[in-house]
């Protein structure tokens, strides 16, 4: 195989179907899709032809594949320039890539160079498609690109499709002017410079306007020529307007300047500077706590001993809300105001919702006599409450019993349960671990790794990162395969066999596809034998089918 062909094969657009490149996911990337379809057509035509006895066709196919790669790269550069939302108003070739809900219309281009005479491509002529033989020689297409999609809104613009000159009968292609990319780059650079200079002017302004005046290094002119930019977000002030209508902060040197008496934080008349409503006022806080307790009829709730020793059920909300209110009061002094207390009392004493029902039950418990507390079974609580001390003793005994039970359960726990403690949170963790170990064991069982010490060393270093989910299995394959040094080598591997390998790879399962795409890099980069690569791909496919069963 020729050296010129071999260096292009590893990165052909055909491989983009195997590897999930982000730029091939979106439907808006029409040029990449067209190029990939073109490469598929070329390979299909190649398989249909008998190229073993026709070496000249093989050379033509390789040249066409190289062209498809350069064409796709050029189209991506064009899309990157056209998708830039800010273009010059008077640019020689102005285009927008707009997308509608109806979908993206595909545009099929004619063959450019050295394609087979059996393939026909439709040629767009005045809205009609005519089959044209693609045996024509392609001109120099360094500056010829696929043009962005035109929608119904841009009918007044000149169509960028290929057309036939009726007067001369020759095919002319409207090419993308070289000055377009230069003008777009120049406009973007000027825009970034103007923005940076404008920011510096704002920081160091003494008496200038905060808005974007006419002396702002041309940002106003450039903003008028933008297509997609909404300039309403910028506050523009007319420099020629009457000074009395300008804002007051315009004359300030800076809002946070230390010499500005109006912006000094130490001269506040009210707010944080007041000492009457200091946060350290404990009388107001104590009064507020008592008032809140009285609002829900908890007379004895404020005693610290009972509050600390009170064994709260899991679903209680009384003590939780009280702690929340105390924490809130410590950070928000305004919450002690009468209006805030009235709102909270209204919230705590309202008649709807599960919170009000719980408060009613709590007030019932604390306000009834000892004989009446035995009727708690009607509310769902099947235990007897004595006085406060008995209740605290019962709570502590329950705590002790719970701790003893936890300690006994930990002592009687099996070691296997400790190792698999995290599996209870994720039921699929054990299954995923077993599956991953199956893949790793499959890699270790390959003769390729057993006879290659460098691959084994790389695998040992990579496995910890793989178990920590820092890399996926395809990355493990790429790292391990790239570390190989000794493997079956075959020089001048024929192109048809490589194409058949890629065609078979595209039909495989995800695991086998990842293995095949990783091993194919060794085929093109280090002349790995295609037979050996096909054998590894076959073993990966067998393992995947067994795993599915």
UniProtKB/Swiss-Prot annotation:
Q: Does the keyword Cell cycle apply?
A: yes
Give a yes or no for keyword Oxidoreductase in this entry: no
Q: Read off the InterPro entries from this record.
A: Tas3_C
Q: List the disulfide bonds.
A: none
Q: Which GO terms describe its cellular component?
A: cytoplasm; mating-type region heterochromatin; nucleus; pericentric heterochromatin; RITS complex; spindle pole body; subtelomeric heterochromatin
Gene that this sequence comes from: tas3
Classify the main location.
nucleus
Annotated source species: Schizosaccharomyces pombe (strain 972 / ATCC 24843) (Fission yeast)
Can you name one GO molecular function term for this protein? siRNA binding
Location(s), subcellular: Nucleus; Cytoplasm, Cytoskeleton, Microtubule organizing center, Spindle pole body
Stretches of Basic and acidic residues bias are at 328-361, 403-416
Quaternary structure? Ago1, chp1 and tas3 interact to form the core of the RNA-induced transcriptional silencing (RITS) complex. The RITS complex interacts with the RDRC complex via interaction between ago1 and hrr1. Clr4 has a role in mediating this interaction.
Record's protein name: RNA-induced transcriptional silencing complex protein tas3
Which one GO biological process term can you cite for this protein? heterochromatin formation
* Role according to the record: Has a role in the RNA interference (RNAi) pathway which is important for heterochromatin formation and accurate chromosome segregation. A member of the RNA-induced transcriptional silencing (RITS) complex which is involved in the biosynthesis of dsRNA from primer siRNAs provided by the RNA-directed RNA polymerase (RDRC) complex.
Gene3D superfamilies tied to this protein: 1.20.920.40, 6.10.140.1690
Quote the biased-composition stretches of kind Polar residues, using this chain's numbering: 298-307, 419-430
Q: Print the keywords alphabetically.
A: Cell cycle, Chromosome partition, Cytoplasm, Cytoskeleton, Nucleus, RNA-mediated gene silencing
Q: Where is this region: Disordered?
A: 89-111, 126-184, 202-225, 298-361, 381-430
């Amino acid at each position: 195989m020729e050296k010129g062909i071999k260096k292009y094969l590893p990165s052909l657009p055909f491989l983009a179907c195997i590897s999930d490149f982000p730029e091939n996911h979106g439907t808006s990337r029409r040029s990449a899709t067209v190029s990939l379809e073109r490469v598929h057509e070329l390979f299909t035509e190649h398989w249909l032809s008998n190229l073993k006895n026709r070496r000249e066709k093989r050379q033509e196919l390789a040249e066409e594949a190289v062209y498809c790669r350069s064409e796709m790269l050029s189209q991506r550069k064009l899309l990157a320039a056209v998708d830039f939302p800010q273009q010059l108003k008077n640019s020689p070739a102005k285009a927008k890539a707009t997308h509608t809900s109806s979908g993206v219309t595909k545009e099929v281009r004619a063959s450019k160079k050295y394609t087979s005479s059996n393939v026909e491509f439709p040629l767009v002529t005045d809205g009609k498609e005519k089959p044209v033989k693609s045996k024509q020689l392609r001109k120099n297409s360094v500056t010829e690109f696929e043009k962005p999609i035109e929608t119904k809104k841009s009918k007044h613009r000149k169509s960028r499709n290929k057309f036939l000159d009726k007067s001369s009968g020759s095919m002319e292609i409207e090419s993308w002017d070289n000055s377009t990319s230069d003008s777009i780059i120049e406009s973007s650079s000027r825009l970034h410079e103007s923005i940076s200079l404008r920011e510096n002017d704002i920081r160091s302004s003494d008496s200038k306007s905060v808005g974007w005046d006419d002396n702002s290094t041309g940002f106003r002119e450039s903003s008028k020529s933008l297509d997609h930019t909404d300039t309403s977000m910028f506050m523009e002030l007319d420099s020629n307007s009457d000074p009395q209508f300008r804002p007051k902060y315009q004359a300030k040197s800076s809002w946070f300047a230390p010499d500005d008496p109006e912006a000094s934080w130490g001269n506040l008349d009210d707010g944080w500077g007041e000492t009457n409503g200091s946060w350290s006022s404990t009388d107001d806080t104590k009064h507020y706590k008592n008032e809140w307790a009285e609002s829900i009829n908890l007379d004895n709730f404020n005693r610290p001993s009972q509050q600390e020793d009170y064994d709260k059920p899991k679903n209680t909300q009384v003590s939780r809300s009280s702690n929340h209110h105390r924490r809130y009061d410590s950070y928000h002094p305004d919450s002690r105001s009468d209006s805030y207390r009235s709102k909270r009392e209204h919230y705590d004493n309202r008649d709807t919702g599960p919170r009000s029902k719980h408060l009613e039950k709590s007030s019932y418990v604390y306000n009834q006599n000892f004989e009446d507390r035995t009727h708690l079974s009607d509310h769902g609580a099947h235990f007897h409450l004595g006085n406060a001390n008995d209740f605290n003793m019962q709570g502590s005994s329950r705590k002790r019993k719970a701790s003893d039970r936890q300690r006994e359960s930990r002592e009687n726990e099996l070691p296997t349960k400790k190792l698999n403690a995290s599996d209870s949170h994720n039921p699929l963790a054990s299954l995923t671990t077993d599956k991953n170990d199956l893949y790793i064991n499959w890699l270790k069982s390959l003769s390729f790794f057993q006879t290659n010490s460098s691959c084994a060393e790389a695998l040992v270093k990579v496995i910890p990162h793989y178990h920590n989910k820092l890399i996926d299995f395809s990355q493990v394959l790429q790292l391990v395969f790239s570390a190989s040094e000794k493997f079956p080598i075959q020089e001048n591997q024929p192109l048809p066999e490589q194409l058949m390998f890629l065609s078979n790879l595209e039909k495989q399962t995800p695991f086998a596809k990842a293995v095949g795409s990783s091993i194919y890099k060794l085929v093109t980069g280090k002349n790995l034998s295609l037979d050996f690569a096909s054998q590894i791909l076959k073993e990966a496919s067998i393992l995947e089918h067994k795993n599915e069963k």
